[in-house]
Amino acid sequence: MNVFVDTSAFYAVMDADDEHHPAALPVWVDLLEGAHRLYTTSYVLVETLALLQSRIGMDCVRLFSADIQPLLQVFWVDEGTHRSAHHALLVAGRRDLSLVDCVSFEALRQLRLTEAFCFDAHFAEQGVQIMPEHLKGGIA
């Protein structure tokens, strides 16, 4: 199975104090043990590294870079994808929706992915099957 991984999931896996950590860890282990192909975007990587650096520190950034990043298939965002996502952001006109989210949705469409490991309700709004499934109604 091919699965998109969002910043919200990466952060929940990396930070034991995060409210979603208990739900994230078993999903992460299952994904790794199941030999699933894990996808993300270059924008999610930038967002994740910045978040880890500011909230946890550089040791966490190094750990993520050494142990998690090599496991990922990275969708490198080109100008066309950026423009499409930027347009989608402007059309949506919502303060709670980010450019990184819109880039992720565009990447999901281009990669024909239907499942995402995340704690972001915007993915479910896009018709994406999210993991952990039981959190569909209760994520931020």
Task: Label the model's feature ranges.
Residues 50-52, 59-76:
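Helix-adjacent hinge/juxtasegments
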Residues 6, 48, 108-109:
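Hydrophobic residues within well-ordered alpha-helices
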Residues 105, 110-140:
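Acidic, PIN/NYN-like endoribonuclease modules and their adjacent C-terminal/linker elements
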Residues 1-39, 53-63, 135-140:
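Short, well-structured N-terminal submotif of metal-dependent ribonuclease cores
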